[in-house]
Amino acid sequence: MYRKISFGDFQTGTIGISVKKALIEGPIRFLQKEKQKMGKRLSYESIEASPEIQNWLTQFAASDALAAKSLLSRLEFISRDEYSEWLLKELASLSNQDKSAIYSVRKFDKDDGNGCLWQKDGKIQLRPAQTQGSEDFVSSIISNANRLYNKCFLDHPSLMELRDYRIRNIILVDDSIGSGKRVSDFIAMMTKSKTFMSWWSFGFIKLYILCYARTVQSETYIRKHIAGSDHGQRINRVSSKIQFISHIVYDSYNVHGRWGENLQSILSLCMSYKKNK
């Protein structure tokens, strides 16, 4: 019944995949047509005045229309341009240090490369032929940054390139992080390589995780599941080898703060349509 939105806009008030599935292209087209700015929320007046949104609302039962409007009014839409400008700015600040490697975080199938990011010959696992949505968009920004900043980044390098260039800083880029599992799984695929794991264990590698929006809880999850120890007596503690850089950081448990007084009706709406999808 529902169509997923493209990367063009995402929201920081997520309460689960059911909300994301409730978003389709009508509100997105409206925002793009009106050239809304970063973090723009839809007013009830704009919701009522938009033919695109009114058409979007027809998929809901009349009794659910108010909850659907409440959901829309609490979303914050971020444009592609806004995200791109933020990411390029952050990459510029990191371009002043030694040459770094950049990888766009993506989800792999469990059987890809026996769980390792790199193949046996040291080359990175091939990207799938089908589109990866936001990951493809992030990859295009990375390529642009490399041209702008005098090729100070290695774009998805092999293990041999990491070794030959003596790379010490690795940047992992994502659009937004919820639970942290996708990033954690990606790092686990990196440390699956004995060579990379050796560099990581001896403190030769530092990870920078760049994402526009993330939950407070995701940082805890990623640190907990990454290889190594954060014990105070360890020389190369995990916490000293990983840094998070985000524009928006929010508490995933503060659902009332994000969804307002109509939280319960929004939750009921999402759960109802999740069951019926």
Where are the regions a protein language model picked out?
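PRPP-associated nucleotide enzymes
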Residues: 2-277
